Amino acid sequence: MKEMNRREFLTLSGASVAMLALAACGGAPSTPVAPTGKEAKVLEALNLYRGELSPLTLDSGLNKAAEEVAKMILLNKPLDDMNSYAEFDKAIAGYKKAEAYQPIGLSMNVETNKAAPRYVCQDDAKLMGEQLMAQTGDPALKQLKSPKLKLVGIHVFEYGSATYWVAVVAEGGKTA
């Protein structure tokens, strides 16, 4: 067995303590994140659309779910089986009623079963909010009027020559 000098021992001990601390807390909790850039504009637009309802809070775990929705769109393949949704389902697991709400900004072609983006991201949050208010026939958007919704995840992405956004909502955070 190799003898360690003091520095090696302290380094190893410190790493062990850090690993034990992470293991004890069960990993990083999903927490609200401060929106920046385009996500902040989309969040502002969504809250403008909600009107008098309490504002939605951006959640890092739901951001991952929104990213999975964008990946489904970018694949440009038919979403024919449940495996197509596996990563999205993992990302929303544990969120209160997240599975009950449709992703916002996702449009499905019923003939090809391919996903497409619906809402273009713009620099003017007020204009985006007004455009959301003018939309008709989008059940995913109508669900934003639910007072039960508290959290949102947003992902902004490039598709073709435009920038789009998608959002995923939940009534509450992850349960232990």
Where are these regions (language model features)?
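Short arginine-rich
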Residues: 20-21, 77
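N-terminal secretory signal peptides and thylakoid transit peptides that target proteins
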Residues: 1-20
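Cell-envelope/ECM-targeting effectors and their regulatory/trafficking segments
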Residues: 12, 28-30, 45-48, 151
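Short, well-ordered surface patches within globular domains
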Residues: 33-95
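A well-ordered secondary-structure block
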Residues: 88-175
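Second-shell loop/turn segments in exported
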Residues: 31-36, 51-58, 114-119, 126-130
